[in-house]
């Protein structure tokens, strides 16, 4: 590596488990050369990058610092820009009013030429400022509400044991652990530790070898599969919604799909011809239309752009039901989760109160 001066990295964290992500970050932090990185992994950008280059509407803008610093500077820039636009518009209105008053009074003194020049200058400035303002994208709108609340105890693992044939270690080994109403749990561990398997056990897709999972009455589970297997890929987005809600008015369906950024052409395109991100939005919409008070989310931010991730995070923060999520998106885990379940790979589950950053601090990895 001593001969390499620069790395060009295109989505380097895709498909990596958390231990490998941590190794990559340590390696890149020690690398003495330059790095040009394209990534949607906000946590990774926060830990590695010293400058952020934003591309928006065909324009680029640079920000010094990591991803958090970029967010802060961008917010300040947009607020300052909005203030300058407002001030400029008020000055144009003032000058226009003054010129109109002078015209009505037939009072053409020496200042009229100066005022015309000031008005022209302010109009040019306003035009320039508005060019700096990013075009507002139609935001993705989630509206997630739980059904009637479940009991305080949502579910319990009792002596839960599972081992796969050919694997020399258990996935679960006599696990005793519970989930409470309103908890938002992030499940982390190396690939193969059983993260997704845990969700599938709760969803009764996989049976335990021993023990039970006691799901309390009134618990309604919604499951987001990372491969979107609950969708019918031969259907269009409209047909997928009609299948779930046959009595919903067509106009309401179109309006709802519009809120999820589906155009007129896209709503009549079979899902198999849509992108991964577009299918992910349909899978999330399907989940929102179902009546549930517990969500099992398997890599819910895969294929979503940053705006969609932020919309999803805000929605899940306000969701009053229970959430259990498997995700390699550490920024997402920070924003949504209040508890981390760590699967070390020995059949146990270690509970860490707090979000992912709290978990790292306890592990001495922050």
Question: For the regions a protein language model found, what residue spans apply to each?
Answer:
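ABC ATP-binding cassette signature C-motif
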Residues: 1-85, 149-366
């Amino acid at each position: 590596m001593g001969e390499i001066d620069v790395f060009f990295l295109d989505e380097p964290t895709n498909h990596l488990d958390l231990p490998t992500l941590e190794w990559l970050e340590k390696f890149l932090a020690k690398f003495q050369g330059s790095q040009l990185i394209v990534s949607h992994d906000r946590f990774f950008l926060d830990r590695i990058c010293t400058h952020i280059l934003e591309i928006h509407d065909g324009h680029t803008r640079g920000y010094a610092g990591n991803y958090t610093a970029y967010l802060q500077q961008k917010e300040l820039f947009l607020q300052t820009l909005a203030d300058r636009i407002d001030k400029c518009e008020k000055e144009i209105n003032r000058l226009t009013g003054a010129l109109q008053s002078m015209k009505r009074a037939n009072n053409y003194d020496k200042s009229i030429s100066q005022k015309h020049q000031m008005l022209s200058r302010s109009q040019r400035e306003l035009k320039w400022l508005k060019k700096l303002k990013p075009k507002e994208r139609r935001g993705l709108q989630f509206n997630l509400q739980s059904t009637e609340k479940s009991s305080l105890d949502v579910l319990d693992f009792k002596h839960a044991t599972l081992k796969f044939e050919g694997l020399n270690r258990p996935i679960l080994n006599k696990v005793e652990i519970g989930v409470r109403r309103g908890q938002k749990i992030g499940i982390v561990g190396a690939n193969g530790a059983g993260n997704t398997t845990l969700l599938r056990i709760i969803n009764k897709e996989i049976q335990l070898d021993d023990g039970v999972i006691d799901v309390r009455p009134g618990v309604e589970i919604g499951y987001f599969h990372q491969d979107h297997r609950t969708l019918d890929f031969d259907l269009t987005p409209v047909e997928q919604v009609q299948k779930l809600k046959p009595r919903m008015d067509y106009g309401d369906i179109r309006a709802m799909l519009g809120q999820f950024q589906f155009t007129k052409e896209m709503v009549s395109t079979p899902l198999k011809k849509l992108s991964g991100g577009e299918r992910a939005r349909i899978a999330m919409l399907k989940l929102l239309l179902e009546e549930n008070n517990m969500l099992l989310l398997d890599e819910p931010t895969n294929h979503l752009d940053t705006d969609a991730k932020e919309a999803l995070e805000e929605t899940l923060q306000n969701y009053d039901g229970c959430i259990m999520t498997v995700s390699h998106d550490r920024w997402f885990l920070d924003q949504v989760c209040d508890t981390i379940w760590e699967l070390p790979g020995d059949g146990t589950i270690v509970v860490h109160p707090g979000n992912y950053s709290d978990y790292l601090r306890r592990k001495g990895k922050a």
